[in-house]
């Protein structure tokens, strides 16, 4: 026989080397949906212990971006890993569908409600627009391989969800947490509406920084409050000086605020040219700063008083004809300014609190469009930000401006319009943080939640401690109505509000939110009451919509009804970006405590923001945006999924073409490992060909044991949501334990052993067990590729890998086995040392390849005893044609030291002939008649009983 190719067990598989994912994945998706993969998973897991990851809803506007992809892929990985861990883990994706961005898009096309289009028609157009946006985003998410209830997602605009949002409001009101108040709220003049805390972002803004004088209304009374040296009361007008960066709020000033324990100084300012002498009052600590910036060089102190001493002293408003009192507040600091705070209760939270304490007027001279109202003296009709200059002019005319300069500082802006906002007192509905102890309960509840990373707890606690009342009302058209009736004269809620809310909710369940605006009050409460009560026409903050989904979705959907369990929380896990401590995590927690006295989640996991390779934010202007669609079209979704899983997502997550290329390289290594397994299982039938564990070749049992060890670590990492740890362990297993050692060693046996022999079947048994485990490890991350592998694997199996659980057929070497794990670790060290010297010999042209080498290992007694356990099979482990072990004392002059203690190695070129079939060089090549070009081992593997392997 001259051609022995047909006698080899050559690898063969339909699993291609190239993934070609961009083209192949869409075909797999079609099959998943045609065969109802998600439904099959649900059937397989019915009755198992539940796990609920509740989806924070993205906003239904625009294409998905890379941050959306990161978030949804992480969720999908967790859901799939929980499923493989034996949990029933349904996933209902959601969308946030009400609110201003959608209104603005519809306004562009249809005009403002009440002008070119009725409010009812406008709402319907908003509903249509949001539905279209949901469909577009849904297809993008499905393309990423994310499994869920895509045919029945939750949308906050679904009639049933809208009804449950209204019911949530009713529950919160019933528990005593609802409050109506005239309070300053974040107000966007472009939106014409109040903003939630989470809708405010801070950016640098240049404002006028001014020091303003309020003259004393009664100088003699004021002087009595200072400790003055006798006869040294000074001369000139007396003023107290405030500092502000919002001159436009001065028309609403109703007090100057001091701190009770601060020391204030009365300063004599000398006359200077045409400037007469004057006396001013500021905090002692800041006096020098004030004098320096005002350019005042000649001054001295006259006397001192505490803030408490000066309480209720009267001062003249700088340009209106009334006086304002000095009041006390804890918010006054000496970080900057004058130690005296301009107080406009209608334009600031702290000012409002102080104003209530001192019964000050809550003046609000500014309209919803940011323009002073017609009766505003001096400034009527001016926009507040343009009025700053006018206010400065008036202050100069009145001699009240001590100093001004341009000042850059962090200032609140509308997250949508990116424009500066104002604080403006308006009648609004609030969830009170304190009137029924909500703040304290919310803070207490954070202790029962597992926050990942741990700093999430202190972050959200700080935010809850410092947050104002939650303003839940909006003056918008497209939103869930605040479905309440209030008395026309007293503004009190209707005494039968709970029953009325349920009636409205039932109407909304049937007809949507338009039912609220259409219904006649008399239909709900009778004509007599209808004359006394009126509808609230405000809509709910969209953060309320999404915040109550623990009730409106999780507690309400049939998919989350687990009849055999008593669940203590609505959800097991919330997973969103770290910005949601001030957004969805907080709105969910507050509403859940208000409604149910418990947190809505057991665990909260956060991920960082996506940045480019240089750590910069994604920006169209910079040109560094990575769009998910571009990645899936070019590389495939599994590459994107592997990138997500490989990152330490608790910090900022970097992405770029170069980073994705590295993910693609890692993917190829994993794919090639899987392909080796599949190709070498060619002709293997697990029903008939499995070798019992105790009869397997030692190295094969070691390999299965390495898979068992890897699986323990991988499953643990999945359970801890440590996807980074999963991918690292997966790569280590594929590249190091398998690729660099086991798969390299077994090639000779797998390819050349007698077909169907124990030597071959033992190896295939190991490969089979390992790939059964490997495909499951991959499935949550590289879902498409795992499905592809699954369909190429031998043996009867379920249609999909995703309906099963972690492979339980793995086993390892016993600790007391002669060829234990420790033994194989040492052998790998020996092999590594030999390989280094073989590589040197190759470079020096002593040999061509390793099979052209014969190696002699000179080892100390202990090491030699271990190596000799492999007997003649040592050469197969070293992949050399011959390998002998000799005592260290016999080492030749040409033997070289190695990194392994007690080991020297001599490499020599073999003089034996090369076997045409196995490529080993052995003395018996050509000695057997009829097989002149192959070795005796190969002859036995072709015509005889086949070689016997015990160790490798």
Swiss-Prot record:
It is found in: Cytoplasm. It holds the Pfam family Anticodon_1. GO terms for molecular function: aminoacyl-tRNA deacylase activity; ATP binding; isoleucine-tRNA ligase activity; tRNA binding; zinc ion binding. Monomer. Catalyzes the attachment of isoleucine to tRNA(Ile). As IleRS can inadvertently accommodate and process structurally similar amino acids such as valine, to avoid such errors it has two additional distinct tRNA(Ile)-dependent editing activities. One activity is designated as 'pretransfer' editing and involves the hydrolysis of activated Val-AMP. The other activity is designated 'posttransfer' editing and involves deacylation of mischarged Val-tRNA(Ile). Gene3D superfamilies: 1.10.730.20, HUPs (3.40.50.620), Ile-tRNA synthetase CP2 domain-like (1.10.10.830). ATP binds at residue 620. Binds 1 zinc ion per subunit. Transmembrane segments: none annotated. Belongs to the class-I aminoacyl-tRNA synthetase family. IleS type 1 subfamily. GO terms for biological process: isoleucyl-tRNA aminoacylation. Its EC number is 6.1.1.5. A motif ('KMSKS' region) lies at residues 617-621. The keyword Signal does not apply. Its cofactor is Zn(2+). InterPro entries: aa-tRNA-synth_I_CS, aa-tRNA-synth_Ia, Anticodon_Ile_BEm, Ile-tRNA-ligase, Ile-tRNA-ligase_type1, Ile-tRNA_ligase, M/V/L/I-tRNA-synth_anticd-bd, Rossmann-like_a/b/a_fold. A motif ('HIGH' region) lies at residues 58-68. GO terms for cellular component: cytosol. Keywords: Aminoacyl-tRNA synthetase, ATP-binding, Cytoplasm, Ligase, Metal-binding, Nucleotide-binding, Protein biosynthesis, Zinc. This is Isoleucine--tRNA ligase. IleRS has two distinct active sites: one for aminoacylation and one for editing. The misactivated valine is translocated from the active site to the editing site, which sterically excludes the correctly activated isoleucine. The single editing site contains two valyl binding pockets, one specific for each substrate (Val-AMP or Val-tRNA(Ile)). It catalyses: tRNA(Ile) + L-isoleucine + ATP = L-isoleucyl-tRNA(Ile) + AMP + diphosphate. L-isoleucyl-5'-AMP binds at residue 576.
